[in-house]
Amino acid sequence: MILLRSLLFLFSLVLLTPPYSLVALLTFPLPTLLRYRVISYWSRIALWLLRVLCGIRYEVRGRENIPTTPTIILAKHQSAWETLAFQQIFPPQVWVMKRSLLWVPFLGWGLAMLRPIAIDREAGRAALKQVTEQGRDRLQHGFWIVIFPEGTRVEPGKTGRYGIGGAWLATHTGTQVLPIAHNAGEFWGRNALHKLPGVITVSIGPPIDPADMKPAELNEKVQAWIEGEMTKMQMAGVKHQASPQVGARQTSHE
């Protein structure tokens, strides 16, 4: 049954994405913020399909920590799920991503319309300069910036190398950082066809002020909070089936 439900979800996305990508292209003349709201509605539909077809819901802890001003999100990366859910949990945002994602037919077209910071991971300091310049521009235009410091999806229970880019941007623009931990990989793993029913937990930490910090120091502080929170989740065994109370509480977010 799980395989069938997962296939239905995949098939639904395959049907939905091409026409929605064409809609995304038609939003080009619109102001950037309005364009974002139209395009990001795709993620709301995808999360609804995920809930109805696969039984995956989510809960958010620490919502009171979300600032009211543009912020840099540094988050754990385990799944494709967070790229959908963050659009619904947080204010309008752009992502730092590998440039090759923009070449994916249909999906890449929609991503390009959202003005991401698309970098060449092998470019070294040139990539840092690009992130700093474009990141400052996006922040000044009122957008949040989402960065996955590990750079790629990491299996549950494992930790990737935390890249310095997000901390570098924060310290060079004086922008606070919001650390995010979650366990989405327990339900929708990297390249996994099966989507396991249950409740994904998203934990939002207190904002971190980068004032008087070196990038490396800030990066270590972010990693310590995220990985500490991941350990707490694993010890608490937060992988569980959805309860009616939790499901009802999250309906407005999916």
Task: Specify the residue positions occupied by each region the protein language model found.
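Glycine-rich helix-loop-beta junction characteristic of Rossmann-like nucleotide cofactor-binding loops
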Residues: 62-66
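Thr-Gly-centered strand-to-loop micro-motif
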Residues: 61, 96-98, 119-121, 149, ...
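Generic preference for hydrophobic
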Residues: 60, 73, 95-96, 202-204
